[in-house]
């Protein structure tokens, strides 16, 4: 049960930040109606499925062969494998989003990011011009800034000038430049677009896995578990009758898992309709607006050139009259 708790926490971490309302409902369905039911009820129902599978023969190996024919994969193991595979795209999305957030934090607090945010005009001579006083002041400011940055952290200039290797590092607040704010905003927007795109991709893969497991469950087990199973597989010397334990209870459980899988497929399609198509429409509209603006700028910048008409004219002075 501890392994299922870890999986639940990981799924909740993915949903809390980036998922839609439909995704939250889907998480509830997966956690309550799948993980908890399979972990608590399923183990009790299918605990003795092989030991209670009895055939009316004493032939050695006949019971095992007939059980393998009746249930190629145990119901409970099939559903556990289904839960793991269906949750894999969400776990990949968690890894991607955490990686992007870590990269954003590193880019925000790195010294390269601080250097890029500085105005080039200030490094030349400040807003006052490129004179001697401004140049000398800017050089002194650059030297102070270099002395203030130790190990990638902005330090107190007074303590840094006195001590070569400070024991206590004091961080000073840096006022961001407008260009740096624009760069950070564009970087954050690109990161959010990448996360949204990856979220749509993982929903598509998750829905494909749901449909695949739903079809596989139908071809393996059907919609019912028979109480009597006839088997003539080797090493049985003749056709024998085998009896399945708790057939009605297993049939109810099988139909319930069919219903849960169908609900998950419908919720995935609804989330794609809510999230995916809207994103596609916005992307198409943005691309069209961008092409239109580029076309207008090019037509505005290019000079108008009159093209001579080399065709036949209707003038009376024409040579072809």
From Swiss-Prot:
Residues 1-19, 99-197, 276-321 are cytoplasmic. The keyword Membrane applies. Residues 120-141 are annotated as: Disordered. Gene3D superfamilies: Gap junction channel protein cysteine-rich domain. GO terms for biological process: cell-cell signaling; chemical synaptic transmission; neuronal action potential; visual perception. It is a multi-pass membrane protein. This is Gap junction delta-2 protein.
């Amino acid at each position: 049960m501890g392994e299922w708790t870890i999986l639940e926490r990981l799924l909740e971490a993915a949903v809390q930040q980036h998922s839609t309302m439909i995704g939250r409902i889907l998480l509830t369905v997966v956690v309550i109606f799948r993980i908890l039911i399979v972990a608590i009820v399923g183990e009790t129902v299918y605990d003795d499925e092989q030991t209670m599978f009895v055939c009316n023969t004493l032939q050695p190996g006949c019971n095992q062969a007939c059980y393998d024919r009746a249930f190629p994969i145990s119901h409970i193991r099939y559903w556990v494998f289904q839960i793991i595979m269906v949750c894999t795209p969400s776990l990949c999305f968690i890894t991607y989003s955490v990686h992007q957030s870590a990269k954003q934090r590193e880019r925000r607090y790195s010294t390269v990011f601080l250097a890029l945010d500085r105005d080039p005009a200030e490094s030349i001579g400040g807003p006052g011009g490129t004179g001697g006083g401004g140049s000398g002041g800017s050089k002194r400011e650059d030297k102070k800034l270099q002395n203030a940055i130790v190990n990638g952290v902005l330090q107190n200039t007074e303590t840094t000038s006195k001590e070569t290797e400070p024991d206590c590092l004091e961080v000073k607040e840096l006022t961001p430049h407008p260009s740096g704010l624009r760069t950070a905003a564009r970087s954050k927007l690109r990161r959010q677009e990448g996360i949204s795109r990856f979220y749509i991709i993982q929903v598509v893969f998750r829905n494909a896995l749901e449909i695949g497991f739903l079809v596989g469950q139908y071809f393996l087990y059907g919609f019912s578990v028979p109480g009597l199973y006839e088997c003539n597989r080797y090493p049985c010397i003749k056709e024998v009758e085998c009896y399945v334990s708790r057939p009605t209870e297993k049939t109810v459980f099988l139909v319930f898992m069919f219903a849960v899988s169908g609900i998950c497929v419908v919720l995935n399609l609804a989330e794609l309709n809510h999230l995916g198509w809207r994103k596609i429409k916005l992307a198409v509209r943005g691309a069209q607006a961008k092409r239109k603006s580029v076309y207008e700028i090019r037509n505005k910048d290019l000079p108008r050139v009159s093209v001579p008409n080399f065709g036949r004219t209707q003038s009376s002075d024409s040579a072809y009259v």
